Amino acid sequence: MGAMRDKILSVLEDYDKANIHIGTIGSHSALNILKGAKDEGFSTVCICREREKKVYESFGVADKFVIVSDYSDLLDENIQEELRHLNTILIPHGSFNAYIGKFDSLLLPMFGNRELMIWETDRDRQREWLERSGVRMPKKYSRPEEIEGLAIVKYPGAKGGKGYFIVSSPEEFYEISDEMVKKGLIGEEDIKNAEIQEYILGANIYFSFFYSPVYGRVELIAVDRRYESTADALGKVPAKEQIRANINPTYTVIGNFPVVLRESLLVQAFEAAEGIVEVSKEIAYPGMVGAFCIESIFDENALMYVFEISARIVAGTNVGIPTSPYSYILFGENMYMGRRIAREIKLAAEKDMLGELIY
Protein backbone atom coordinates (compact mmCIF):
# COMPACT_ATOMS: atom_id res chain seq x y z
CA MET A 1 0.00 0.00 0.00
CA GLY A 2 3.06 2.29 -0.27
CA ALA A 3 1.89 3.72 -3.61
CA MET A 4 -1.49 4.54 -2.06
CA ARG A 5 0.16 6.38 0.82
CA ASP A 6 2.24 8.38 -1.66
CA LYS A 7 -0.99 9.49 -3.39
CA ILE A 8 -2.51 10.53 -0.05
CA LEU A 9 0.60 12.50 0.90
CA SER A 10 0.49 14.20 -2.52
CA VAL A 11 -3.06 15.38 -1.75
CA LEU A 12 -1.91 16.61 1.67
CA GLU A 13 0.97 18.50 0.05
CA ASP A 14 -1.54 20.63 -1.89
CA TYR A 15 -3.52 21.56 1.24
CA ASP A 16 -3.55 25.05 2.74
CA LYS A 17 -2.16 24.02 6.15
CA ALA A 18 -3.42 27.25 7.74
CA ASN A 19 -7.04 26.38 6.86
CA ILE A 20 -7.44 22.71 7.71
CA HIS A 21 -10.87 21.28 8.45
CA ILE A 22 -11.23 18.26 10.72
CA GLY A 23 -13.92 15.95 9.36
CA THR A 24 -15.63 12.68 10.19
CA ILE A 25 -18.75 10.64 9.52
CA GLY A 26 -21.69 11.72 11.71
CA SER A 27 -21.99 8.71 14.01
CA HIS A 28 -20.13 6.64 16.64
CA SER A 29 -17.81 9.22 18.29
CA ALA A 30 -18.29 12.21 15.98
CA LEU A 31 -19.39 14.51 18.82
CA ASN A 32 -16.14 13.70 20.62
CA ILE A 33 -14.00 14.24 17.51
CA LEU A 34 -15.68 17.45 16.31
CA LYS A 35 -15.85 19.08 19.75
CA GLY A 36 -12.18 18.24 20.30
CA ALA A 37 -11.27 19.84 16.98
CA LYS A 38 -13.16 23.03 17.85
CA ASP A 39 -11.51 23.16 21.29
CA GLU A 40 -8.15 23.22 19.48
CA GLY A 41 -9.24 25.98 17.09
CA PHE A 42 -10.02 23.96 13.95
CA SER A 43 -13.00 24.36 11.63
CA THR A 44 -15.05 21.16 11.36
CA VAL A 45 -17.02 19.29 8.72
CA CYS A 46 -19.55 16.54 9.41
CA ILE A 47 -20.42 14.02 6.68
CA CYS A 48 -23.89 12.75 7.54
CA ARG A 49 -27.35 11.84 6.33
CA GLU A 50 -30.14 14.41 6.60
CA ARG A 51 -31.73 12.50 9.49
CA GLU A 52 -28.59 12.66 11.67
CA LYS A 53 -27.84 16.30 10.89
CA LYS A 54 -30.07 17.53 13.73
CA VAL A 55 -27.83 15.83 16.33
CA TYR A 56 -24.70 17.72 15.28
CA GLU A 57 -26.61 20.96 14.70
CA SER A 58 -28.09 20.79 18.19
CA PHE A 59 -24.66 20.41 19.79
CA GLY A 60 -23.08 23.07 17.57
CA VAL A 61 -19.97 21.03 16.79
CA ALA A 62 -20.03 21.19 12.97
CA ASP A 63 -19.13 24.31 11.01
CA LYS A 64 -20.05 22.67 7.70
CA PHE A 65 -22.15 19.69 6.66
CA VAL A 66 -21.72 17.42 3.67
CA ILE A 67 -25.05 15.64 3.30
CA VAL A 68 -25.07 12.14 1.81
CA SER A 69 -27.85 9.62 1.23
CA ASP A 70 -25.59 6.79 2.41
CA TYR A 71 -22.18 6.82 4.08
CA SER A 72 -20.76 4.88 1.15
CA ASP A 73 -21.19 8.16 -0.79
CA LEU A 74 -17.96 9.21 0.91
CA LEU A 75 -16.26 7.21 -1.84
CA ASP A 76 -17.91 9.36 -4.54
CA GLU A 77 -15.35 11.53 -6.33
CA ASN A 78 -17.54 14.67 -6.13
CA ILE A 79 -17.88 14.31 -2.36
CA GLN A 80 -14.16 13.73 -1.99
CA GLU A 81 -13.36 16.77 -4.15
CA GLU A 82 -15.59 18.92 -1.93
CA LEU A 83 -13.74 17.67 1.16
CA ARG A 84 -10.34 18.18 -0.45
CA HIS A 85 -11.37 21.76 -1.30
CA LEU A 86 -11.94 22.28 2.44
CA ASN A 87 -8.46 20.87 3.23
CA THR A 88 -10.15 18.10 5.21
CA ILE A 89 -8.29 15.61 7.37
CA LEU A 90 -10.61 12.69 8.12
CA ILE A 91 -10.70 11.10 11.56
CA PRO A 92 -11.80 7.44 11.31
CA HIS A 93 -14.00 5.69 13.87
CA GLY A 94 -15.98 2.45 14.02
CA SER A 95 -18.42 3.46 11.28
CA PHE A 96 -15.53 3.63 8.80
CA ASN A 97 -14.90 -0.11 9.18
CA ALA A 98 -17.69 -0.99 6.75
CA TYR A 99 -15.73 0.72 3.97
CA ILE A 100 -12.24 -0.56 4.76
CA GLY A 101 -12.25 -2.89 1.75
CA LYS A 102 -12.74 0.17 -0.47
CA PHE A 103 -10.06 2.39 1.06
CA ASP A 104 -8.20 2.42 -2.26
CA SER A 105 -11.02 4.65 -3.52
CA LEU A 106 -10.70 7.08 -0.61
CA LEU A 107 -8.14 9.65 -1.73
CA LEU A 108 -8.41 11.84 1.34
CA PRO A 109 -5.81 12.36 4.07
CA MET A 110 -6.86 10.29 7.07
CA PHE A 111 -5.42 10.62 10.56
CA GLY A 112 -3.96 7.28 11.64
CA ASN A 113 -2.99 4.21 9.67
CA ARG A 114 -5.65 2.73 7.39
CA GLU A 115 -3.58 -0.44 6.88
CA LEU A 116 -3.72 -1.17 10.62
CA MET A 117 -7.50 -0.78 10.43
CA ILE A 118 -7.44 -3.61 7.88
CA TRP A 119 -5.42 -5.72 10.35
CA GLU A 120 -7.99 -4.84 13.03
CA THR A 121 -10.96 -6.16 11.05
CA ASP A 122 -9.25 -9.40 9.97
CA ARG A 123 -9.45 -11.73 13.00
CA ASP A 124 -6.48 -13.88 11.97
CA ARG A 125 -4.21 -10.92 11.27
CA GLN A 126 -5.29 -9.20 14.46
CA ARG A 127 -4.42 -12.29 16.49
CA GLU A 128 -1.03 -12.51 14.77
CA TRP A 129 -0.40 -8.86 15.69
CA LEU A 130 -1.30 -9.46 19.34
CA GLU A 131 0.67 -12.70 19.59
CA ARG A 132 3.77 -11.00 18.19
CA SER A 133 3.28 -8.24 20.76
CA GLY A 134 3.70 -10.79 23.56
CA VAL A 135 0.40 -10.14 25.31
CA ARG A 136 -1.49 -12.82 27.22
CA MET A 137 -4.53 -13.95 25.19
CA PRO A 138 -7.52 -16.29 25.57
CA LYS A 139 -7.21 -19.62 23.76
CA LYS A 140 -8.67 -19.71 20.23
CA TYR A 141 -10.78 -22.61 18.95
CA SER A 142 -10.42 -23.24 15.20
CA ARG A 143 -13.81 -24.96 14.94
CA PRO A 144 -16.86 -25.55 17.15
CA GLU A 145 -15.92 -29.20 17.74
CA GLU A 146 -12.86 -28.06 19.74
CA ILE A 147 -14.92 -26.19 22.34
CA GLU A 148 -14.30 -27.32 25.91
CA GLY A 149 -15.52 -25.19 28.78
CA LEU A 150 -16.91 -21.69 28.38
CA ALA A 151 -16.29 -19.99 25.03
CA ILE A 152 -17.48 -16.72 23.48
CA VAL A 153 -18.50 -16.54 19.82
CA LYS A 154 -17.72 -13.32 17.90
CA TYR A 155 -17.99 -12.00 14.35
CA PRO A 156 -15.78 -9.91 12.04
CA GLY A 157 -16.02 -6.13 11.92
CA ALA A 158 -17.26 -3.47 14.33
CA LYS A 159 -20.68 -4.90 15.19
CA GLY A 160 -20.77 -3.46 18.71
CA GLY A 161 -21.10 -6.91 20.25
CA LYS A 162 -24.32 -7.64 18.37
CA GLY A 163 -25.09 -11.36 18.26
CA TYR A 164 -22.13 -12.43 20.42
CA PHE A 165 -22.97 -15.35 22.68
CA ILE A 166 -21.45 -17.78 25.18
CA VAL A 167 -21.45 -21.57 24.84
CA SER A 168 -19.92 -24.53 26.67
CA SER A 169 -20.06 -27.29 24.04
CA PRO A 170 -20.17 -27.85 20.25
CA GLU A 171 -23.84 -28.85 20.52
CA GLU A 172 -24.69 -25.62 22.29
CA PHE A 173 -22.82 -23.63 19.62
CA TYR A 174 -25.01 -24.99 16.82
CA GLU A 175 -28.19 -24.74 18.88
CA ILE A 176 -27.69 -21.09 19.83
CA SER A 177 -26.37 -20.17 16.36
CA ASP A 178 -29.62 -21.40 14.81
CA GLU A 179 -31.58 -19.43 17.38
CA MET A 180 -29.59 -16.24 16.68
CA VAL A 181 -30.16 -16.60 12.93
CA LYS A 182 -33.92 -16.98 13.48
CA LYS A 183 -33.91 -13.82 15.63
CA GLY A 184 -32.10 -11.93 12.86
CA LEU A 185 -29.14 -11.12 15.11
CA ILE A 186 -26.68 -12.87 12.76
CA GLY A 187 -26.68 -14.39 9.28
CA GLU A 188 -25.67 -17.84 8.04
CA GLU A 189 -22.43 -16.35 6.68
CA ASP A 190 -21.57 -14.99 10.12
CA ILE A 191 -21.58 -18.51 11.57
CA LYS A 192 -19.00 -19.66 9.01
CA ASN A 193 -16.76 -16.68 9.82
CA ALA A 194 -17.23 -16.80 13.59
CA GLU A 195 -14.25 -16.53 15.90
CA ILE A 196 -14.49 -18.76 18.97
CA GLN A 197 -12.39 -17.78 21.99
CA GLU A 198 -11.98 -19.21 25.46
CA TYR A 199 -14.20 -17.15 27.78
CA ILE A 200 -12.15 -15.75 30.66
CA LEU A 201 -14.22 -15.06 33.76
CA GLY A 202 -13.29 -11.64 35.07
CA ALA A 203 -13.72 -7.90 34.70
CA ASN A 204 -13.82 -6.50 31.16
CA ILE A 205 -11.69 -3.36 30.94
CA TYR A 206 -11.16 -1.19 27.84
CA PHE A 207 -8.01 0.97 27.69
CA SER A 208 -8.02 3.92 25.30
CA PHE A 209 -4.42 4.78 24.50
CA PHE A 210 -2.87 7.34 22.18
CA TYR A 211 0.47 6.96 20.41
CA SER A 212 2.02 10.34 19.66
CA PRO A 213 4.56 10.48 16.81
CA VAL A 214 5.21 14.11 17.82
CA TYR A 215 6.26 13.18 21.36
CA GLY A 216 7.25 9.57 20.61
CA ARG A 217 5.27 8.21 23.54
CA VAL A 218 2.28 6.08 24.55
CA GLU A 219 -0.39 7.96 26.53
CA LEU A 220 -3.31 6.55 28.53
CA ILE A 221 -6.29 8.82 27.85
CA ALA A 222 -9.28 6.97 29.35
CA VAL A 223 -10.51 3.64 30.70
CA ASP A 224 -14.06 2.31 30.45
CA ARG A 225 -16.31 -0.70 30.64
CA ARG A 226 -19.38 -1.43 28.55
CA TYR A 227 -23.08 -1.58 29.32
CA GLU A 228 -24.35 -4.53 27.29
CA SER A 229 -27.79 -5.82 26.36
CA THR A 230 -29.01 -8.32 27.41
CA ALA A 231 -26.09 -9.50 29.54
CA ASP A 232 -26.28 -6.61 32.00
CA ALA A 233 -30.03 -7.05 32.45
CA LEU A 234 -29.84 -10.67 33.59
CA GLY A 235 -29.05 -9.69 37.18
CA LYS A 236 -32.61 -8.36 37.43
CA VAL A 237 -34.10 -11.73 36.46
CA PRO A 238 -34.21 -14.46 39.15
CA ALA A 239 -32.15 -17.57 38.28
CA LYS A 240 -35.29 -19.75 38.23
CA GLU A 241 -36.91 -17.52 35.64
CA GLN A 242 -33.76 -17.45 33.50
CA ILE A 243 -33.77 -21.24 33.36
CA ARG A 244 -37.51 -21.43 32.71
CA ALA A 245 -37.37 -18.85 29.90
CA ASN A 246 -34.18 -20.38 28.44
CA ILE A 247 -32.56 -16.92 28.21
CA ASN A 248 -29.30 -16.70 26.27
CA PRO A 249 -27.50 -13.41 26.98
CA THR A 250 -26.27 -11.28 24.09
CA TYR A 251 -23.65 -8.53 24.21
CA THR A 252 -24.90 -5.63 22.09
CA VAL A 253 -23.14 -2.51 23.41
CA ILE A 254 -25.61 0.15 24.58
CA GLY A 255 -23.24 2.50 26.38
CA ASN A 256 -20.10 2.86 28.47
CA PHE A 257 -19.05 3.61 32.05
CA PRO A 258 -15.80 5.29 33.15
CA VAL A 259 -13.39 3.16 35.19
CA VAL A 260 -10.49 4.06 37.47
CA LEU A 261 -8.26 1.02 37.78
CA ARG A 262 -6.20 -0.14 40.74
CA GLU A 263 -2.92 1.65 40.16
CA SER A 264 -0.85 -1.53 40.51
CA LEU A 265 -2.63 -2.98 37.45
CA LEU A 266 -1.66 -0.17 35.08
CA VAL A 267 1.80 -1.60 34.40
CA GLN A 268 0.25 -4.59 32.56
CA ALA A 269 -1.74 -2.22 30.35
CA PHE A 270 1.28 -0.05 29.50
CA GLU A 271 3.43 -3.08 28.72
CA ALA A 272 0.73 -4.40 26.38
CA ALA A 273 0.33 -1.00 24.69
CA GLU A 274 4.06 -0.55 24.15
CA GLY A 275 4.41 -4.05 22.66
CA ILE A 276 1.45 -3.49 20.34
CA VAL A 277 2.88 -0.16 19.12
CA GLU A 278 6.33 -1.65 18.47
CA VAL A 279 4.93 -4.55 16.41
CA SER A 280 2.65 -2.15 14.49
CA LYS A 281 5.78 -0.50 13.05
CA GLU A 282 6.90 -3.89 11.70
CA ILE A 283 3.59 -4.90 10.10
CA ALA A 284 2.27 -1.62 8.64
CA TYR A 285 4.51 1.41 8.12
CA PRO A 286 4.56 3.95 9.75
CA GLY A 287 2.93 1.96 12.56
CA MET A 288 0.38 3.12 15.12
CA VAL A 289 -0.68 6.74 14.93
CA GLY A 290 -3.05 8.29 17.44
CA ALA A 291 -5.94 6.56 19.18
CA PHE A 292 -6.15 2.83 19.81
CA CYS A 293 -8.03 0.65 22.26
CA ILE A 294 -6.90 -2.50 24.05
CA GLU A 295 -9.87 -4.66 25.02
CA SER A 296 -9.03 -6.84 27.99
CA ILE A 297 -10.22 -9.00 30.86
CA PHE A 298 -8.66 -9.17 34.33
CA ASP A 299 -9.17 -12.59 35.93
CA GLU A 300 -9.49 -13.44 39.64
CA ASN A 301 -5.70 -13.26 39.98
CA ALA A 302 -5.66 -9.77 38.41
CA LEU A 303 -3.90 -11.11 35.32
CA MET A 304 -4.67 -9.18 32.14
CA TYR A 305 -5.81 -11.02 29.01
CA VAL A 306 -6.06 -9.07 25.74
CA PHE A 307 -8.83 -10.30 23.46
CA GLU A 308 -9.09 -7.52 20.88
CA ILE A 309 -7.59 -4.28 19.59
CA SER A 310 -9.06 -1.29 17.73
CA ALA A 311 -6.60 0.85 15.76
CA ARG A 312 -8.72 4.02 16.00
CA ILE A 313 -10.87 5.99 18.41
CA VAL A 314 -13.56 3.90 20.14
CA ALA A 315 -16.91 5.03 21.53
CA GLY A 316 -15.77 4.27 25.08
CA THR A 317 -13.57 7.38 24.97
CA ASN A 318 -16.76 9.45 25.19
CA VAL A 319 -16.79 8.80 28.96
CA GLY A 320 -13.58 10.87 29.16
CA ILE A 321 -15.18 14.15 28.02
CA PRO A 322 -14.07 16.74 29.16
CA THR A 323 -11.32 14.78 30.89
CA SER A 324 -10.44 11.54 32.66
CA PRO A 325 -8.25 11.18 35.76
CA TYR A 326 -5.45 9.82 33.57
CA SER A 327 -5.50 12.50 30.88
CA TYR A 328 -5.80 15.25 33.51
CA ILE A 329 -2.77 13.95 35.41
CA LEU A 330 -0.79 13.80 32.16
CA PHE A 331 -1.78 17.18 30.70
CA GLY A 332 -2.86 19.25 33.71
CA GLU A 333 -5.91 20.45 31.77
CA ASN A 334 -9.11 19.03 30.36
CA MET A 335 -8.10 16.51 27.70
CA TYR A 336 -10.14 13.82 25.95
CA MET A 337 -9.55 11.71 22.88
CA GLY A 338 -11.17 14.00 20.30
CA ARG A 339 -9.20 16.95 21.61
CA ARG A 340 -5.99 14.90 21.88
CA ILE A 341 -6.27 13.96 18.19
CA ALA A 342 -6.74 17.61 17.22
CA ARG A 343 -3.86 18.68 19.47
CA GLU A 344 -1.54 16.20 17.73
CA ILE A 345 -2.57 17.51 14.30
CA LYS A 346 -1.97 21.10 15.44
CA LEU A 347 1.45 20.29 16.90
CA ALA A 348 2.45 18.31 13.81
CA ALA A 349 1.41 21.17 11.51
CA GLU A 350 3.58 23.57 13.53
CA LYS A 351 6.56 21.19 13.32
CA ASP A 352 6.02 20.29 9.64
CA MET A 353 5.29 16.67 10.66
CA LEU A 354 1.75 16.22 9.28
CA GLY A 355 2.94 13.59 6.81
CA GLU A 356 3.87 11.31 9.74
CA LEU A 357 0.28 11.30 11.02
CA ILE A 358 -1.54 10.65 7.76
CA TYR A 359 -2.45 7.58 5.75
UniProtKB/Swiss-Prot annotation:
One of its GO terms (biological process) is 'de novo' IMP biosynthetic process. PANTHER family: 5-FORMAMINOIMIDAZOLE-4-CARBOXAMIDE-1-(BETA)-D-RIBOFURANOSYL 5'-MONOPHOSPHATE SYNTHETASE, 5-FORMAMINOIMIDAZOLE-4-CARBOXAMIDE-1-(BETA)-D-RIBOFURANOSYL 5'-MONOPHOSPHATE SYNTHETASE-RELATED. GO terms for molecular function: ATP binding; ligase activity, forming carbon-nitrogen bonds; magnesium ion binding. It comes from Archaeoglobus fulgidus (strain ATCC 49558 / DSM 4304 / JCM 9628 / NBRC 100126 / VC-16). The gene is purP. Its cofactor is Mg(2+); Mn(2+). InterPro entries: ATP_grasp_subdomain_1 (IPR013815), IMP_biosynth_PurP (IPR023656), IMP_biosynth_PurP_C (IPR009720), IMP_biosynth_PurP_N (IPR010672), PreATP-grasp_dom_sf (IPR016185). Belongs to the phosphohexose mutase family. This is 5-formaminoimidazole-4-carboxamide-1-(beta)-D-ribofuranosyl 5'-monophosphate synthetase. ATP binds at residues 144-206, 228. NCBIfam families: PRK13278.2-4.
